[in-house]
Amino acid sequence: MEGAAGRGHAGVTDTRLMSIVHEVSGTASYQAGASPVPAVGGRRLPFLDRARIYACGITPYDVTHLGHAAAFVWIDALTSTLRFLGIEPEVCRNITDVDDVLDEAARRAGTPYDSFAAVQQYHFEQDMAALGVRAPVHGPRAHRYVQQVIRLAAGLLDGGAAYAREGSVYFRGQAAPGRAGLERAEALRLSAEYGGRPDDPAKEDPLDVAVWQASEPGHPAWDSPWGAGRPGWHAECAAMALSVFGVGVDVHAGGKDLRFPHHAYHAAMAETFTGVTPYARAWLHVGTVTTGGAKMAKSAGNLVLVRDLLAGYPAAAVRLMILDRGWADDWDYRPDLLDAAAARLERLYSAAGRWAADDDVTGIGRLLAADLNVPAAIDYAIETGGAPARMLATVLGLS
């Protein structure tokens, strides 16, 4: 937190308390077989020693805002919790650098799309590092997986789950809304909102989606058996996940707004291609962050930027503001929430500095294993003090 020197409230940056918290070295506090079985989304997930986590990354066309950050801080909390429980997380966080929105942003900037994407990715990674979010083990970029998408398209065609028309390959998606519990009308609305082109006349059904999209003049394109084109959004993620992890993952994580259409089609394509179900043992759909009751959007002028938050508060306070609630909960950002988080962080640090007769940290493990119940874990740590408070601060990246 000293990296945020001069940016936080005095109590939050107390160096004595910081040194107390840092007395905890490492997070592996359980012997093999002794740790509680973690649960995500109410689903118990027994592990031996490794967890495969696919995190839907950014489309690098703009600055990182709080809505983005919330998802990645929660994913970081999940991976740290697993590590604390003796399970090594293997995280794959992709970069969607082949996308219509990115292409349009690069055109407006007068910059080649790949150079534009690389610069935005750099800024994103700087913001994540400033928030204390660990870098993933794997960081695939979509443009490097074009051949894998072509193989995916060919396999779906061979199985009759897709069809080729006018240089594109479409996945039959009528069943996809059911994966998200949606009626057809709502699925069509979301498909249009997220660039699914339900009005494309080449489709057999408006809910079909492009695995391979025929090229348009002046847009990025690659050769394929169906002509020049580019990967579809959902197919990119499916191809990257299957390439990195094989037939499936333990946890697929991302913002709740990605549940449909993106995650539903990604999983459907993966399961259809491999024949293995389920593609994901559990889903971590992080709640949406709004401001003034509205979804953050550049067009609305209401973005809350990570870099602006970190100019006034230490990263630990921003992380605690994000984490001190249920991970699936939607919430509305207000500046006073940061003040409340900073005050709660001071109480946690004070508790960490107290002597406590009981240095057993397993209570923290049980609470975090129970679907990442961070609020209850913080309450317990503040009440108990000592080693549990120090350990929790370490696990949640609040030290």
Regions found by a protein language model. Give the residues of each.
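Terminal accessory/anchoring regions of large secretory-pathway or extracellular enzymes
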Residues: 349, 362-365
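N-terminal, positively charged nucleic-acid-binding surface of large information/translation enzymes
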Residues: 44-130
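Alpha-helical recognition segments enriched in aromatics with Gly/Pro capping
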Residues: 11-61, 76, 147-343, 349-356
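Short, glycine/charge-rich beta-strand/loop segments that flank catalytic centers
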Residues: 95-100, 124, 134-149, 166-175
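Basic, alpha-helical terminal appendages of large translation-related enzymes
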Residues: 1-46, 105, 112, 116, ...
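Non-catalytic interaction-recognition regions
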Residues: 83, 125-147, 151, 256-259, ...
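Extended alpha-helical coiled-coil "stalk/arm" regions
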Residues: 356-362
